[in-house]
Amino acid sequence: MLPEKRLLTPDDMKLWEESPTRAHFTKFIIDLAESVKGHENSQYKEPISESINSMMNLLSQIKDITQKHPVIKDADSSRFGKVEFRDFYDEVSRNSRKILRSEFPSLTDEQLEQLSIYLDESWGNKRRIDYGSGHELNFMCLLYGLYSYGIFNLSNDSTNLVLKVFIEYLKIMRILETKYWLEPAGSHGVWGLDDYHFLPFLFGAFQLTTHKHLKPISIHNNELVEMFAHRYLYFGCIAFINKVKSSASLRWHSPMLDDISGVKTWSKVAEGMIKMYKAEVLSKLPIMQHFYFSEFLPCPDGVSPPRGHIHDGTDKDDECNFEGHVHTTWGDCCGIKLPSAIAATEMNKKHHKPIPFD
């Protein structure tokens, strides 16, 4: 079967939350997080397996595609997402099976078909030109699928799946976010961790659990943030936020991160991040109604048959009007288009008129 979306109602969500599929996937995330405790970004686990190198080559192919589609139309006039992102998306989608086959030749045609859906959906929504934690989730499903098919061995690869593969994925997403001004999907405004990502904070908190000197409150020290931005995921995310939301303090534009900084230890932060991921991503219907079940992520018995809301990368604007689709004022899916902070910052730079003393 092709991967399909099945979560449409609160009853479906209850079945999902109690399912072995969710438990196994959550354990996969936690195992990856546990494997990077005490590791800086560059502290890979040696030797690096052929499978990790193949995944890095796959990401390199995706990165190459980003270079083929420069922003041309309305480059200076719109605060919303750039339409050239759709060309990037289309090229990835056309070539996803070919790219997967080139790096993982042992996979069957059926396995490639399953995995290609998650690879396509890892980079954002073509129609809305946005990105959020649901798209990030698709990338983790891709890694989980490769693990399920025997490509990755967690005893050898888990640390490098975060420190090499996930970090490279994050770098590519930063390119896409800044180049195409991707709009935030699933953002809770200033009450979210980040306009786009969740897992860098989760993995980053686990990295820091054994650090003797850095504390959660350290994110308010800009010198420390800059010093450790390339060494720890959490500080890298704070540095990125400070860069694109430079007109105000972290306390104002990211109050949830500010609240978390008051926690005494990174271990408590890490524990809280797991709980938050389960509650705010894996248990939110506006996000999970877009979740694909597949051969390696089987749908729980009793869940609604496939119908309703389907985002397939087409330009059909009626896809959010099916019966059963849950709308949300948070913008997790079909809400008001929100310009990204990146777009606002870049537009301000373009139209800024310096005073004579600058």
UniProtKB/Swiss-Prot annotation:
GO terms for molecular function: peptidyl-prolyl cis-trans isomerase activity; protein phosphatase regulator activity; protein tyrosine phosphatase activator activity. It holds the Pfam family PTPA. Its EC number is 5.2.1.8. Present with 2430 molecules/cell in log phase SD medium. It comes from the Eukaryota. This is Serine/threonine-protein phosphatase 2A activator 2. It catalyses: [protein]-peptidylproline (omega=180) = [protein]-peptidylproline (omega=0). PPIases accelerate the folding of proteins. It catalyzes the cis-trans isomerization of proline imidic peptide bonds in oligopeptides. Acts as a regulatory subunit for TAP42-associated PP2A-like phosphatases modulating their activity or substrate specificity, probably by inducing a conformational change in the catalytic subunit, a direct target of the PPIase. Can reactivate inactive phosphatase PP2A-phosphatase methylesterase complexes (PP2Ai) in presence of ATP and Mg(2+) by dissociating the inactive form from the complex. Acts also inhibitory at high concentrations. The keyword Nuclease does not apply. It is found in: Cytoplasm. Keywords: Cytoplasm, Isomerase, Rotamase. Interacts with the phosphatase PP2A catalytic subunits PPH21 and PPH22. Forms a ternary complex with PPH21-TAP42. CDD domains: PTPA (cd04087). GO terms for cellular component: cytoplasm; nucleus; protein phosphatase type 2A complex. GO terms for biological process: mitotic spindle organization; response to osmotic stress; TOR signaling. It is an enzyme of class 5 (isomerase).
